[in-house]
């Protein structure tokens, strides 16, 4: 789905808005409906719709790259494209499926201490846009030794607020539409949703593909490095996007390395001449770049470049 198609799909839901639900996910791994007064619920819907228009529909600079190609670009919603999903994604799907007549409400006597996240379901055009926001420590205002909440009464006196307040702003960390998930706040994915487990699982897929390719004589060095999350990310990325791994035969790769003016001095080949020796951190680094096809040579100047951003001109 292109960015424009995503905008159009969301616009149809917003333009044909038919209702909103707010669902809490709890530390007990449960979903609980909120009971919010009608006018307040309308204000919540209006706030989130305005935010969606600002972030997505009216954002001319918006892009929607794949999450496995994550970088620090602004105005981006990263489409989740890994095989393994965080548990929170399943909760979003389950929240969408809650029957309209469900009475399974959140108990406010728990004072929001057991709330883990908030799912906002915006319905329209017989479809649902599901926003997810992680509950932060600042989301609940409560009296404590370090914090005292005061509110004015009708006579102008400040009185202690006896109850907790749930503060709900209109930011969100990710959303789902149809079967697709888009990430807005990558930090929440990293710190709250055990995303490292997803990365590690994808890295295992890359290692299995490399093992099956018979391209490397001893893969144990890569396996050891894969325990570091930074390197696991690189393996995960080539498992998804390598134009080399699984597409170019081993002999062609070996011949390319042996004849390459730069790589031939960095990547060693075994005595039989049919496998690469990838043992050092340096060789691992350049092997990953080889699998990403980052080494490019100008036909005009014959200069060899290392290019991470490759915008194809033949598509």
UniProtKB/Swiss-Prot annotation:
Chloroplast found in the keyword field: no
Keywords, A to Z?
Antiviral defense
Q: Which domain of life is it from?
A: Bacteria
Knockout mutant characteristics: Cannot be deleted in a Kiwa-containing strain of E.coli.
Task: Give GO BP annotations, semicolon-separated.
Answer: defense response to virus
Q: Which InterPro entries match?
A: KwaB (IPR048119), KwaB-like (IPR032359)
Tell me, what's a Pfam family for it? KwaB
The UniProt entry, under NCBIfam families, shows: KwaB
Task: Describe the function of this protein.
Answer: Component of antiviral defense system Kiwa, composed of KwaA and KwaB. Expression of Kiwa in E.coli (strain MG1655) confers resistance to phages lambda and SECphi18.
Q: What is this protein called?
A: Kiwa protein KwaB
Gene giving rise to this polypeptide: kwaB
């Amino acid at each position: 789905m292109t960015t424009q198609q995503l905008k159009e799909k969301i616009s149809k839901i917003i333009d044909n808005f038919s209702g909103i639900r707010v669902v809490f996910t709890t530390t007990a791994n449960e979903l609980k409906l909120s009971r919010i007064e009608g006018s307040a619920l309308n204000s919540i819907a209006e706030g989130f719709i305005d935010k969606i228009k600002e972030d997505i529909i009216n954002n001319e600079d918006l892009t929607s790259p794949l999450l496995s190609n994550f970088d620090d670009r602004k105005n981006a919603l990263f489409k989740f494209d890994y095989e393994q999903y965080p548990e929170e994604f399943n909760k979003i799907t389950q929240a969408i499926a809650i029957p309209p007549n469900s009475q399974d409400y959140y108990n406010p006597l728990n004072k929001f201490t057991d709330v883990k996240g908030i799912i906002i379901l915006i319905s329209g055009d017989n479809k649902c846009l599901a926003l997810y926001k992680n509950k932060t420590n600042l989301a609940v205002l409560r009296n404590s030794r370090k914090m005292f909440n005061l509110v004015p009464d009708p006579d102008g006196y400040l009185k202690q607020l006896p109850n907790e307040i749930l503060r709900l702003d209109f930011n969100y960390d990710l959303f789902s539409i149809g079967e697709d998930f888009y990430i807005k706040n990558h930090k929440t994915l990293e710190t709250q949703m055990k995303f490292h487990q997803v990365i590690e699982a994808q890295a295992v897929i890359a290692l299995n593909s490399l093992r099956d390719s018979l391209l490397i004589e001893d893969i144990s060095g890569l396996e050891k490095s894969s325990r570091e999350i930074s390197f696991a990310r690189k393996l995960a990325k080539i498992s998804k996007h390598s134009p080399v791994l699984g597409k170019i035969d081993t002999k062609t790769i070996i011949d390319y390395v042996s004849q390459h003016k730069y790589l031939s001095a960095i990547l060693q080949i075994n005595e039989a001449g049919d496998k690469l020796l990838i043992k050092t951190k340096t060789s691992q680094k350049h092997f990953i770049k080889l699998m990403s096809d980052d080494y490019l040579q100008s036909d005009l100047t014959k200069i060899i470049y290392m290019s991470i951003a490759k915008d194809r001109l033949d598509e």
